[in-house]
Amino acid sequence: MNTQKRQQIRTEIRKIRANLTALQQHQAEQSVTQHALNLIEQRQAKNIALYFSFDGEISTKALIQSLWMQNKNVYLPVLHPFTKHYLLFLRYLPDTPMKQNQFGIWEPKLNVQNVLPLNELDILFTPLVAFDKKGNRLGMGGGFYDRTLQNWQNKSFIPVGLAYQCQQVENLPTEHWDVPLFDILVG
């Protein structure tokens, strides 16, 4: 029952998100970027993991540009080449060679010299499809971030979701593997 309900929420929220106007998207991106920069400053974060927006997710382009201007280290997720459904985080610079992964998402070409261990991240910003007030997130269904975020409380980083207001639902049905986020920044 939970699986069916979760898939229904994914479908509904993705449809709502796809219907946002360009102006709504831009305003939300500006708002979330400012919230994220404030959080980064408060936590004195230096190593920040982000993602390239996909399928209508809130854009991270302005945030990435701002972080580069502040000399912060930006990392993007890469599908782990050997451990299925896990992510690695690679340093991302303006000249980093990129490729599309099996899902059509742009990621840095794997270079082990650019991999940062999770314990060295300060903030890990995550995409999401839906969220609730308790910090529960619903992703695309692959479990990549749930696996990556397991036991995040024992690591040095905090996981923070980035979302549009329209992605909030009253109560998300959860599974035992779901990992609530430290915070969700909404635009």
From Swiss-Prot:
| Residues binding ATP | R6, Q7, Q8, I9, R10, G139, M140, G141, G142, G143, F144, Y145, D146, D178
* Catalytic activity of the protein: (6S)-5-formyl-5,6,7,8-tetrahydrofolate + ATP = (6R)-5,10-methenyltetrahydrofolate + ADP + phosphate
A matching Pfam family:
5-FTHF_cyc-lig
Alphabetically list the UniProt keywords: ATP-binding, Ligase, Nucleotide-binding
Q: In which pathway does it act?
A: One-carbon metabolism; tetrahydrofolate interconversion
The EC designation for this entry is: 6.3.3.2
GO terms (molecular function) for this protein are: 5-formyltetrahydrofolate cyclo-ligase activity; ATP binding
Which Gene Ontology BP terms does the record give? folic acid-containing compound biosynthetic process; tetrahydrofolate interconversion
Which Gene Ontology CC terms are recorded? cytoplasm
- Give the matching NCBIfam families: MTHFS_bact
**UniProt function note:** Involved in the removal of 5-formyltetrahydrofolate. In vitro, it is a potent inhibitor of various folate-dependent enzymes in the C1 metabolism network and in vivo it might function as a folate storage. 5-formyltetrahydrofolate is also used as an antifolate rescue agent in cancer chemotherapy. Catalyzes the irreversible ATP-dependent transformation of 5-formyltetrahydrofolate (5-CHO-THF) to form 5,10-methenyltetrahydrofolate (5,10-CH=THF). The reverse reaction is catalyzed by the serine hydroxymethyltransferase GlyA (SHMT).
Q: Which family does it belong to?
A: Belongs to the 5-formyltetrahydrofolate cyclo-ligase family.
Which PANTHER family has this protein been placed in?
5-FORMYLTETRAHYDROFOLATE CYCLO-LIGASE (PTHR23407:SF1), ATPASE INHIBITOR/5-FORMYLTETRAHYDROFOLATE CYCLO-LIGASE (PTHR23407)
Q: What is this protein called?
A: 5-formyltetrahydrofolate cyclo-ligase
